[in-house]
Amino acid sequence: MGVRIYKPTSAGRRNMSVSTFEEITKKEPEPRLIEPLRKKAGRNNQGRITVRHRGGGHKRFYRIIDFKRNKFGVPAKVQAIEYDPNRTARIALLAYADGEKRYIIAPLGLKVGDTVMSGPDAEIRVGNALPLSAIPLGTQIHNIELEIGRGGVLVRSAGTAAQLMAKEGDYAIVRMPSGEMRMIHLRCMATIGQVGNVDHQNIRLGKAGRSRWLGRRPRVRGAAMNPRDHPHGGGEGRAPRGMSTPKTKWGKPARGVKTRHNPRFDRFIVRRRK
């Protein structure tokens, strides 16, 4: 993909850049592979805000993506590369030899007309999905399962890739994009290659309205609030926060404090992220 940078014809256009979408080959999604997507605006089932700064945005349909890649031994031809508003990566429409169609995350280099396959006997080629036991060391992979048969949950964002570093017993050691080294069972599936749309990181929204189109609401600084609303609030003019370390809205330490608490899976992390 390419990035188009606008000329500064207005304040909103200054420093704005957009994708050229040159890799997109089909505009309308496959009707059988979409379903309605009801907006939650960051609310839970009680109607309370659990994720702040969410709401509004353009109406979307959810594209049903095949993260499991469990159709073994059946070749599929890439029919189209499509835009998906629900993720940063592009998606590829596959037409299997038996007539079924599925969406997958489009890896870098996958083109219309290419053939992909899943299963332990598939070739080591971009877009093919294999168990980690069948993938050579040093290979770049994405869409990695954490639990056998549950579907890929790791490394699905635009431009990301993990690397298979070692195999010990029943587990593979995979280096994540964050630098974390993690043990994953050898029977878990992964897809060969790097996720496409690598220039996504170079996109600059340019104006607040474009964030609103994406469903992102404004993020207000704590120092701009009243003292009843935030520990940093209050004071005359631009007052210092009045505490040694910054705090969250709920009075907990912010910045540099680890929030991960999942002791069941800590033993699978060989090295923490950088």
From Swiss-Prot:
UniProt key word Chloroplast: no
SMART domains assigned to the protein according to its UniProt record, in alphabetical order: Ribosomal_L2 (SM01383), Ribosomal_L2_C (SM01382)
GO MF terms, alphabetically ordered: RNA binding; rRNA binding; structural constituent of ribosome; transferase activity
Keyword Plastid attached: no
Listed Basic and acidic residues bias regions: 227-239
InterPro entries named among the record's database cross-references: NA-bd_OB-fold, Rib_uL2_dom2, Ribosomal_uL2, Ribosomal_uL2_bac/org-type, Ribosomal_uL2_C, Ribosomal_uL2_CS, Ribosomal_uL2_dom3, Ribosomal_uL2_RNA-bd_dom
Family: Belongs to the universal ribosomal protein uL2 family.
Assembly description: Part of the 50S ribosomal subunit. Forms a bridge to the 30S subunit in the 70S ribosome.
Protein name: Large ribosomal subunit protein uL2
Gene name of the encoded protein: rplB
